A protein has these predicted regions:
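Signature for HUH/AEP ssDNA processing cores
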Residues: 1-124, 131-144
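Amphipathic alpha-helical interaction segments
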Residues: 145-149
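Flexible helix-coil linker/hinge segments at domain or subdomain boundaries
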Residues: 150-155
Length: 155
């Protein structure tokens, strides 16, 4: 099954700085690709390519280019575990191994990977990726999916 998402062509070996992030945000929404999940995992987790999971309808209005009113579809869900100071104080540390061995993750996640920030961090920083059975065209439904996942994994 091919999944549509926005993914850049540039391979990265480190986290982009704030100037690079702004440049990426200005063009990434135009870089729509259709890939199998294995190709997505390799692009993101191995090759460090920046991605945007949703695609959006084209608009001439710059401020609306990645706004919910132009939401087209999304089939991937990604949970970001940063173990920020606030999260640790509120929920404790969420480790990579704990999440990897969680029954829900074993049954439902496609892949997980450590982020660039993990390399210099004392705590684990990683992402877990899920693929939905079909492309979702309702922005609110995507929000509801995230809400339910955040209840399972509040940090």
């Amino acid at each position: 099954m091919k999944i549509e998402l926005c993914i850049e062509d540039i391979q990265r070996k480190s986290k982009p700085n704030s100037d690079e992030v702004r440049m990426i945000q200005n063009v990434l929404y135009k870089k729509i690709k259709k890939k199998e999940i294995d190709g997505i995992a390799e692009s993101i987790a191995v090759n460090g390519k920046t991605s945007m999971l949703a695609t959006y309808f084209e608009t001439g209005e710059f401020s609306e280019r990645i706004h919910s009113i132009n939401f087209k579809q999304q089939q991937l869900i990604m949970l970001d575990f940063d173990n920020s100071k606030v999260d640790i104080e509120k929920y404790g540390i969420t480790t990579y191994d704990y999440v990897r061995n969680h029954d829900f993750i074993k049954q439902n996640a496609c892949f997980m990977y450590r982020t660039f920030s993990d390399k210099e961090a004392i705590v684990d920083k990683f992402r877990v990726v899920f693929v939905l059975n079909e492309s979702v065209k309702d922005y609110l439904l995507i929000g509801n999916i995230y809400t339910k996942l955040f209840r399972l994994f509040p940090s």
